[in-house]
Amino acid sequence: HPLPAHWFFYAGRICQAYLDSHYYQLKREVDSVEKAIKRYLPIFVLPTLAAFIIGFIAPFIMGVGLSFCEFTTVKDAKFVGLSNYVKAFQDTIFRHSFWYTALFAIASLVVINVCAFALALALTRKMRGTNIFRTIFFMPNLIGGIVLGYIWQLIFNGILAKYSTALALNQWLGFWGLIILVSWQQIGYMMIIYIAGLQSIPGEVMEAAQIDGANSWQRLWKVTIPMMMPSITICTFLSITNGFKLFDQNLSLTAGEPSKLSEMMALNIYNTFYGRSGWEGVGQAKAVIFFVIVVAIGLVQLKATRSKEVQQ
């Protein structure tokens, strides 16, 4: 015998009542969580915000202000207008350090990213020991720049001594020494980013390209690299900014020798501020110029690579 129709009606009402009760219970729980978040948000946000303002915003604003002053301490600052900026741009060593740094940033960008991408491709293939190799390649990134600089200085000078020369005697030996050092340190980090990008590519896309007759080289240029643009954007941005901001390795490996010809911008600013009495304001002006250059280059690079992402 078929069940009466009103049985289905009552069963439906019971199910609806059950679901409604759970819905309103869940809604009350969500509302209570939102109220708790709003109530305790200042407790978690304000200390972090205060630390950010005290540790970054306030010193940055103070530094910009001091770039227009002549001073030895903050209390005796005397406003001199754009005089410090004029001296900074007239400093031939500072101008040389800019071009030297720009060349280094471009060269390190190419070397680091080509090697990191090649390693990522190799280590995403099905082979034994990939996790061990990933760890080995990443480990140099954990060592401090100062320590690496002194270690590689001993290595390079030990080799160059056989040819009666040293890093401190030739700016281009120092330049390529820095390229090798920084590449050895950062390739592993960029490799991890590229591996994450490669693993995010859907396997169906690669299979479809292979079925369509694309060889490995065509799949690399037409499929892999276009779909890797987000990872490439991150790595190129990090490589360029790290290249311009390089300080520790430059200080410990070459210290700007010979005659400040291998001195990069960050080291030049440091030597101006702490090494030349009465030039503290000029050093601060150089720091502001340096900040503007790094931000501008970073924004241009991001815009260029982001446009590539959109096109792909």
Predicted regions, residues:
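Short, Lys/Arg-rich, polar N-terminal cytosolic tail immediately upstream
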Residues: Y18-A36
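A structural signal for multi-pass alpha-helical bundles of membrane permease subunits
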Residues: E34-Q312
